[in-house]
Amino acid sequence: NQYDIIICDYSLGKGKNGQQILEELRFTQSLKHRAIYILVTAEATRSMVFGALEYKPDDYLTKPFTPVLLQNRLDNLILEKQFFEKVYEALDNGHYEAAAEHAAVLVNQNRRYRVASLKLQGQALLQSQQFELARQLYHEAMEHRRQEWACIGCARALIGLQKWSSAIHVLSELIDHGTENLQVFDCLAEAELALGRNGVAQAILERATVSSPYGILRQINLAEVASANNDYLAAEKAFRRVIKLGINSCHDSHEHSLG
């Protein structure tokens, strides 16, 4: 079944939690871009928030909240979904080039959604593997103001172009400026691995898993990199976390127990 709005509590008793449901919906591509997913939780710890936001819910509400707050958030999200309807429809159908074209048309139509339009255009260009066009878009956005989302997008485009050192330069600058965005660490580790600097990549992933210990895919990546580095103590520690996080997760695998 397809739903327009999903409001899901993090704590659902036995079985999956709200984050794992969103994780599986993203992984199986069962959640349409046009749908709204709001994650609700009573906890607001740093690691919990980081873990939840990694799977990009449309909004994140901490209890207690008022009906007025919920209504305002829903109203704003519905307006945004309607504005980007053609873009989301193209993304849902895997028509990434068309999605990029639709987003480009919308960039100057509503100042409120200008940045969101650029983000969607860049995302669609990356997904359609138009890496040079994506790099140009993000570079132009960075020239106006050095925004983090544009820097990350530029780095992802550079990785797509296999310009590893250039990507590392952009990402390292973000880290030097104190970024907490975990995409930065994931992309940086990917670039370092491509250059054969596995030890550096492992250190980057270890740092990221301290900030967000609930990200199972990153823990899996760390375990595999540590194993390749013959750092069996670190690998065992990461695999133990993976097994624990894998309970009720769509990413659970018996192979993790053998790691």
Q: What is the role of each PLM region?
A:
Residues 81-127, 136:
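Alpha-helical segment of the N-proximal tetratricopeptide repeat
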Residues 70-81:
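Receiver (REC) domain switch/output surface
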